[in-house]
Curated annotation (Swiss-Prot):
It comes from Pyrococcus furiosus (strain ATCC 43587 / DSM 3638 / JCM 8422 / Vc1). This is Aliphatic sulfonate oxidoreductase, polyferredoxin-like subunit. One of its GO terms (cellular component) is cytoplasm. [4Fe-4S] cluster 1 binds at residues 18, 21, 24, 131. Its cofactor is [4Fe-4S] cluster. PROSITE patterns: 4FE4S_FER_1, 4FE4S_FER_2. GO terms for molecular function: 4 iron, 4 sulfur cluster binding; metal ion binding; oxidoreductase activity. Residues 9-40, 48-80, 82-111 form the 4Fe-4S ferredoxin-type domain. Transmembrane segments: none annotated. [4Fe-4S] cluster 4 binds at residues 70, 91, 94, 97.
Amino acid sequence: MSEEVQERIWILITPDKCSGCRLCEVTCSLEHEGIIWPEASRIRVFELFPGINVPHTCVQCPDYPCVNACPTNALSVDEKTGAVVVNEEKCITCGACVLACPGKVPRIPAGKGSVVICDLCGGNPKCVEICHEAGHDALKIVTGNYRPIYRTFAKDPQEKSLDIARKVFGEDF
């Protein structure tokens, strides 16, 4: 009998609960890089309109377009969490994963030498923890089958911001 596989998780983002404090960015960069380096954070908060903060991270698409686009197989899927994992030694920073991603989530921070994508911190995302501790709860771990709707969440930050601004302000920009 094979080892039991953990149910796959993803991070549900509720932008209207985001204060824009960016503790998630700080915590993520400390967890992954050992320093405060928001540019290398696997989650980013965008404020394209005043007062509308949009946390943005990988939704772990079930068809993994970024993984499939990588010419060097630097991206793989963690068997336990279903998260995309980057092999920094194989990454040639070509940007194929960025182009393939519907949300344009992967980034190549200056000085990093490889792409960064959310790996769900091995199943215990630190950004979700700090957001909860700060009392915002804009980020939440969810499980289950979201295949029918995942493209709803896999949008670029500008598109998400425009959607929210239309709802808040009731007009097009």
